[in-house]
């Protein structure tokens, strides 16, 4: 049976400042940690990325032409405050006013994120969100943006608090490149959630007319053998690291006894302790019912089995299928069952995981209000032929996930929109320019845009709400 989505459903496309804008040192923009980190550790940089800084009118015109009625944009913090605080960069402010005006001109609603992996270097080198001073700096930055940009109707504080901590302190593929420090992972998650809570409370106290939420990456975790208690435990612990800890902070305003038992076990095995203060929980508690929506980024699920050995994580950054490894002492090891398929970057394709995660939020956090799928898509080594890309695999991937959303809505979940990652091809943090996600192919040398087959398909779905 053909499935449908509601008439008022947002069919969006997602971007991020550092991955799309380029212009990393233009018009007074301050440095971010990624600038030097990429030069020192990778074979690519974020110049020119998709040159969105100059070509956003082209991308928004394409969005309008192809039925995309929402766009995720992030503000580059260091474009507004080059050092993270203090002096405002007027040219950065002007750029975002112009960008948001173009969005509204093209009838593409901007969903604006304040922080998408790009803390200004001056703050990052001072401990980033492990340093509690950053909480205050972030809230000041948020307060400025809320007041300066009343044309924005939908705000999110952070993009993917979980993967920021993981990338910086567990996998070590984000600056500062620290590996296997679980205490830093949890502390980063916690301090960022306190920052989120303070910003949300401020937004509501000021009486702004828009909506505000947060974007969490929520990869669903399953036991490899559901009958094996050790595998079940491994999946539960992995879920605490990546999902439950930050969801509890968002919607409970505290960490459940079950969550803290898992955290304490993980730290007892791996070392370290947390600084959780009474005033933190006062802030979390005050904001737990103020979130207007939850953004869920979903790409994949993982299966876990019990594991007693030493921690080892190998990141597959070049699309060499089967080269990744993930095992954490005292938690478990990721082992994919035979029946699931995976991408060249070892990301497991499992649409059912999105349904299960949405229903988990609905059941465990009934104060969630509504959900947007703020990122979902398929990274490909696209083959550019005849001025297009015949990306049937991407179409199939998105179709399956949209069908899952139709099912979730039918089963009572309040899902209001979907943002494909990404609107156009963008630079990828730890994969460079080879891994493409866009509806529009970008020739990174000429910066020309070309609609892929998926863009034509997405337009039809957006216009009809029929998933076909």
From Swiss-Prot:
SUPFAM superfamilies: (Trans)glycosidases (SSF51445). PROSITE patterns: GLYCOSYL_HYDROL_F1_1 (PS00572), GLYCOSYL_HYDROL_F1_2 (PS00653). This is 6-phospho-beta-galactosidase. It comes from the Bacteria. D-galactose 6-phosphate binds at residues 19, 116, 159-160, 297, 428-429, 435, 437. Pfam families: Glyco_hydro_1 (PF00232). The active site is at residues 160, 375. One of its GO terms (biological process) is lactose catabolic process via tagatose-6-phosphate. Belongs to the glycosyl hydrolase 1 family. The gene is lacG. GO terms for molecular function: 6-phospho-beta-galactosidase activity; beta-glucosidase activity. GO terms for cellular component: cytosol. InterPro entries: 6P-beta-galactosidase, Glyco_hydro_1, Glyco_hydro_1_AS, Glyco_hydro_1_N_CS, Glycoside_hydrolase_SF. It comes from Streptococcus pneumoniae (strain JJA). Pathway: Carbohydrate metabolism; lactose degradation; D-galactose 6-phosphate and beta-D-glucose from lactose 6-phosphate: step 1/1. The keyword Hydrolase applies. Keywords: Glycosidase, Hydrolase.
């Amino acid at each position: 049976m053909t499935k449908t989505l509601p008439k008022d459903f947002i069919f969006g496309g997602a971007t991020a400042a550092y991955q799309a804008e380029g212009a990393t040192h233009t018009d007074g923009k301050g440095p971010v940690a990624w600038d030097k980190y990429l030069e020192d550790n990778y074979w690519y940089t974020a110049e020119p990325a998709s040159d969105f800084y100059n070509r956003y009118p082209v991308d928004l015109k394409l969005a309008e032409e192809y039925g995309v009625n929402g766009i995720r944009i992030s503000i580059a913090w260091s474009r507004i405050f080059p050092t993270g605080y203090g002096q405002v960069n007027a040219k950065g402010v002007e750029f975002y006013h112009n960008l948001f005006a173009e969005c509204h001109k093209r009838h593409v609603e901007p969903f604006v994120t304040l922080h998408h992996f790009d803390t200004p270097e001056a703050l990052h080198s001072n401990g980033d969100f492990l340093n509690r001073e950053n909480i205050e700096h972030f809230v000041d930055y948020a307060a400025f943006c809320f007041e300066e940009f009343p044309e924005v109707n939908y705000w999110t504080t952070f993009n993917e608090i979980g993967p920021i901590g993981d990338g910086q302190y567990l996998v070590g593929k984000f600056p500062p490149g620290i590996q296997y420090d679980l205490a830093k992972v949890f502390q980063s998650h916690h301090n960022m959630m306190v920052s989120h809570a303070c910003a949300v409370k401020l937004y509501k106290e000021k009486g702004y007319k828009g909506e505000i939420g947060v974007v969490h990456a929520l990869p669903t975790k399953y036991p490899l053998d559901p009958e094996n208690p050790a595998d079940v435990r491994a999946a539960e612990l992995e879920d605490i690291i990546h999902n439950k800890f930050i969801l509890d902070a968002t919607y409970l305003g505290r960490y459940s006894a079950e969550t803290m038992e898992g955290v304490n076990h993980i730290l007892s095995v791996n070392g370290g302790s947390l600084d959780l203060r009474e005033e933190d929980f006062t802030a979390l508690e005050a904001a737990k019912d103020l979130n207007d929506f939850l953004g869920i980024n979903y790409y994949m699920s993982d299966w876990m089995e019990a594991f007693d050995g030493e921690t080892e994580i190998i990141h597959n950054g070049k699309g060499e299928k089967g080269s990744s490894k993930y095992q954490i002492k005292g938690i478990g090891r990721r082992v994919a069952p035979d029946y699931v398929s995976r991408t060249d970057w070892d990301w497991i394709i499992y649409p059912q995981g999105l349904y299960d995660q949405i229903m988990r939020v609905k059941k465990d956090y009934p104060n969630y209000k509504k959900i947007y799928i703020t990122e979902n898509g398929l990274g490909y080594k696209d083959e550019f032929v005849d001025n297009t890309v015949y990306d049937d695999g991407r179409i199939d991937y998105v179709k399956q996930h949209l069908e899952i959303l139709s099912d979730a809505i039918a089963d009572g979940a309040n899902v209001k929109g979907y943002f494909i990652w990404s609107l156009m091809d963008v630079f990828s943090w730890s994969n460079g320019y080879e891994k493409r996600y866009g509806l529009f192919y970008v020739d990174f040398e000429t910066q020309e845009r070309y609609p892929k087959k998926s863009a034509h398909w997405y337009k039809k779905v957006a216009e009809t709400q029929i998933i076909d």
